[in-house]
Amino acid sequence: MNEKKELQQELELQEFQTPKNQQLEKLQEPNGEISSTGNETSESGISSPPISQNDNSNNENESLNITPNKPFVSMQEELQNLDIENIPIPPTIQTPKIYKNTNNLIHSKNNLSLPISLSQENIVKLDKVDIESNDQVNSNTDNNNNTNNNNNTNNNKNEKIGLRSKIFKSKIFIKIRGWWWHRGISTYIMLFYIALNIGVGVHMFYNMYHSDIFKFLGLSFCFSRTAARLINLNSAVILLPVLRNFLSWLRGTIVNNYIPIDKHLNFHKLCAFMLFCCTIIHCVGHYISFKKINDDVLKIDDGKSVAGDYLNININNFPDEKYLFFKSVPGITGHIMLLILILIVSSSMWRIRRPMFEIFWYVHHLFIPFYILLCFHGYSKILKKDPQSWMWIIAPFILYSIERLIRIARSKKRVILEKAIMHPSKVLELRMKRDNDNFNFKPGQYLYLNCPSIAYHEWHPFTITSAPDDPFISVHINIVGNWTRKLFKLLNPDNKLGLIQEDLKSTQNRGKRRILKIDGPFGAPAENFFKYRNLVLIGAGIGVTPFSSILRHLKNQNDKQTNADENHLKINKIYFIWISRQKNSFQWFTDILAELENDERIDSILEIHIFLTGALELDDYAKIKNAQKCHITNLHSKTLFGRPNFRSIFNQLTQLHQREKIGVFYCGNKALGKNIIKNCNKFNGKNNCHLIFHKENF
């Protein structure tokens, strides 16, 4: 009886500890007995069908030995039929917390913990074990404390890392980082350079202000000498941003992650602006000083000028008052250098450089005689000092000379022109045979093209539109300038559209196949596309050329994948946006776009958005309706009419790519570029999306 009472208590405890989803639903019978209705839950938690009172089948329950042809009985009656030795143990029952460290001592036949009560015998056994293993328990406690301390330390480190990660991925930090990369770092570099000029100028002005010559010539002398020192400084620095081979090498180093090399031309323009302004100040200061010297010399009758006490001049050297202005070494060299700078600055303006690049090219090379004249400008030693300009410019001029020697050596070999294609909208495509050993380039880079038949020393930059894996080198030339028109007439005198390589391969014109020379390749902003898993490529008109090379490269890399599980692209998504006024312009690259659309693996990551901003014809409206493909581009991607709404585009991008980095690449006119970078900066950081803008120097 005692065993039955203990067992009854244990069963009641089991029912109390069993979760609700594993307990049988209990109903109170009228006579006060408990019965089971509905589905019974087995040990495994799987409900079994309800047992009918008239069921004649032999159903065995692992918990209770229920007689088949007998209605449910009370628990007291069932206890009499129980096999105490074979009581099953529900898997959900857990050992009470008091047995946490002694589970190995309390177990049943099936090695599962039982919720047994603490009898006096069990307490004695537990105390004995605790006494015998007191040292071991203390040791385990110390180990646990050390483990907890280590865990706490790791948790603190993880919390710090998590906090740091949250800060770096926060909207404010992304905004600051985006501003720093787009404008901040270049702004600070330019401000630092301006501050350097101010510092050098203030130091020079202070020294001249306290010199003896100041007593005679006054402030005009201080300003002219200060400007002369700044001319030397800017003449030394202005050559560094135009070392194309050096900058191309620098793009492949870690420096490219911290310095905006893409904006090297902006720094070059800043140096040119400082150089031109300092030259004007230098000339005005000397005009005033020369006037003072002439007035002083004309007052002297004994042949000795008062200025001779301060300057290295004599009245015999002054046959007339215009001598210092136009007949002395400083006067002659100074005016020639001033004229050279005026020509260089004026030819660099967009309205002249864009349609007449050859003028810009030739005039810019006048910097060579400018440097030579600068070295001899102070040769007469009027200020009783040796000339110092050569010490400033010797090092950068040597670097530039090495740069030019590399270009000359690399551009001697002529390339074979295999194919020339005249596209609509006055675009000429040239395909040249590639020498894999001497010309290796990256997608997005550019080259310089020379045609000796037109001008032997004239080189023009063009973006490479072929992929590095292609067996040819291709460029697309927009016929807008004098040189490009001459090249077009040379290759296509009959002004035909389409393929014209048959004429090149003919016996009569076979010599034309070797009429071109190339120099390069050179680095460009578009080659940084591999740094991002999400890309936005925006091209306006002929500005699509850098992205043609990128898309062809992705196509070639995808073709190399023999296994569907391989991923040579390492790109998650590409948004290609092409904007043009003329519908015929889209025929330039529709072949590669169609191949990309037909490739399932690339089509899944590539979205093509084409915008036509020009007017449509009446036939276009009829063809647009119910068309399976766009009749303008012959692509599955529909052509959109009008200008793209970049505010909406970037807003959607930040929603689709939350907590991701997107590289935005643009090549086109400045007005559209300002709109893009404005919206790029506006939505940068929204949803923790980092938008990084790269602009091609177009």
UniProtKB/Swiss-Prot annotation:
Membrane spanning stretches: 185-205, 230-250, 270-290, 325-345, 356-376, 389-409
Cytoplasmic-facing ranges: 1-184, 251-269, 346-355, 410-698
Cofactor(s) the record lists: FAD
Amino-acid positions noted as binding FAD in the UniProt annotation, renumbered to this chain: H460, P461, F462, T463, I464, T465, S466
Domain FAD-binding FR-type, residue spans: 404-528
Biological function: Critical component of the membrane-bound oxidase that generates superoxide. It is the terminal component of a respiratory chain that transfers single electrons from cytoplasmic NADPH across the plasma membrane to molecular oxygen on the exterior.
Protein name: Superoxide-generating NADPH oxidase heavy chain subunit B
UniProt source species: Dictyostelium discoideum
Lineage: Eukaryota, Amoebozoa, Evosea, Eumycetozoa, Dictyostelia
Gene this chain is encoded by: noxB
